[in-house]
Amino acid sequence: MRIGITCYPTHGGSGVVATELGKHLARAGHEVAFISYAALLRLSEIPERVSFHEAEGYSYPLLQNYPHGVALASKIVSVARMRHLQILHVHYAIPFAASALMAKYAAPELDLKVVTTLHGTDITLVGSDPTFRPITRWAIEQSDAVTAVSQWLHDEAVKEFAIRRPIDVVYNFIDPERHARPCPGCIPPVSCSGEVTLMHISNFRPVKRTEDVVRVFARVREHLEARLLMVGDGPAAGAAQQLAVDLGVADRVCFVGIVEQIEPILQQADLLLLPSETESFGLVALEAMASGVPVVATHVGGLPEVVSHGETGFLAPVGDVDAMAAYALQILGDRAVHRRFADASRERARLFDYREIVGQYEAIYERVLWQSH
């Protein structure tokens, strides 16, 4: 099949999943064309059967804001004609599904099929805004197929937008071998040390509640020698740094910044903290589990579908830093307990093997192509 993929060119979960999906599809023999506003972080090298096409932006004096959605639709039409695309798989209903549908109707002779994957904020934040609500619902209803990355997100989309069409639940995925493989010498240097290592990985948006990470760590430090690695960057990083100073743990907290490859640094972790206010899936939790790292997170969104409470980690109410600290100590305070959680984490992560999940997407592509005949 000849498949176009559009996603955000960021280090967030949707961009990671979309890029890795495209690479796996290419290895399976499909032709894949990525179309985005900028270079994709997980596509530093262009593999065989993969092409990348940037949707350029231009300034125009009559327009206060550049119409990126229209420009993207035009680029999709151009690439679809050049690469003879059959499928457009867009990750996020807004803005990408709307642009893909615009392209589909602008070039009906191409008979493009639009597959939309809902990742979370396109439903819970952007799409529910009254400004975007009608177009979000339209984009979902008009797509040839729609998937959601968790059952929770599926249910939210149906409830929030009164969706009548079927939505397939297709979970995010990992490559278990890639996470299991040791990587000596390629771990980014970190300047602090400790007996156990807690880790947080995110884009440091307020919804990630990074200050709660620091609060949990400060409580753990009262009982264990530990360090905290804060991986990523974003608007809430400064507040988390200041809180570490205020709580007297700054010398044990390292702000590592953004890393392109997550597997090497996960090999340093004994526990992942993910105290988010909402998570539609929680890809970083799955990546941690695949690396044998138990997870203490919040009982929100799709996280209970990933983290098995009491087996691969624990789930606490949002903002309950005392409960999260107690759970962290329960796992970290006994090596045998930690080993049991680590082994269970690896085992559960295998349920999200890319071979199974990519096969589900291929079946959806074949279904929408068959529907046109």
PLM region descriptions:
Residues 309-310, 314-321, 330-335:
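Conserved acidic donor-binding segment of nucleotide-sugar-dependent glycosyltransferases
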Residues 323, 330, 337-351, 360-363:
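A short, well-ordered alpha-helix in the C-terminal region of glycosyltransferases
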